[in-house]
């Protein structure tokens, strides 16, 4: 049993190191969910690329967390895997909406008083999905922090 504990501790330390590396990459590439009313196509192209890069790194980060959780509590790890899937789905939906804004940047302009219903719906959906992404990411991080404090700290 002691050998198992030593192996688990070593594996957790290795995973923890990988997680720290991914975390520092994420910190450098931090994505702001703040909505800017920029109406240039170039701005939205850059924003989309930044979000895609951020989501790719975030998925690697969350998958690493899920790997750590799976070593300790498979049930919680499976639930976290569902949360990762939802994060990916929300990110994909946000990128799709941002592509629509990229094609018609005036959608985001709140000063435009003659917006069509279509534009208003896209903007509303953008705000909704953007908020959902932010809230879901917070939820995942809080869940992991709690798991870390309760389960992982006692192993490390």
Task: Name each model feature, range by range.
Residues 74-126:
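Long, amphipathic, charge-rich alpha-helical segments that form helical bundles/coiled-coils
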Residues 69, 81-83, 156:
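Extended alpha-helical regions
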């Amino acid at each position: 049993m002691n050998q198992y504990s030593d192996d688990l501790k070593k594996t957790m330390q290795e995973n923890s190191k990988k997680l720290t590396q991914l975390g520092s990459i994420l910190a450098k590439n931090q994505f702001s969910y703040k909505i800017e009313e920029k109406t240039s196509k170039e701005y939205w192209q850059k924003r989309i690329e930044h979000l895609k890069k951020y989501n790719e790194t975030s998925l690697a980060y969350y998958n690493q967390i899920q790997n750590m959780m799976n070593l300790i509590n498979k049930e919680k790890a499976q639930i976290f895997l569902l949360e990762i899937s939802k994060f990916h789905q929300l990110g994909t939906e946000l990128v799709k909406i941002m592509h629509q804004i990229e094609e018609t940047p005036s959608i985001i302009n709140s000063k435009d008083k003659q917006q069509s219903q279509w534009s208003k719906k896209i903007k509303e959906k953008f705000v909704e999905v953007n908020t959902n992404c932010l809230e879901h990411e917070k939820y995942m991080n809080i869940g992991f922090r709690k798991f870390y404090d309760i389960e992982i700290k006692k192993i490390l």
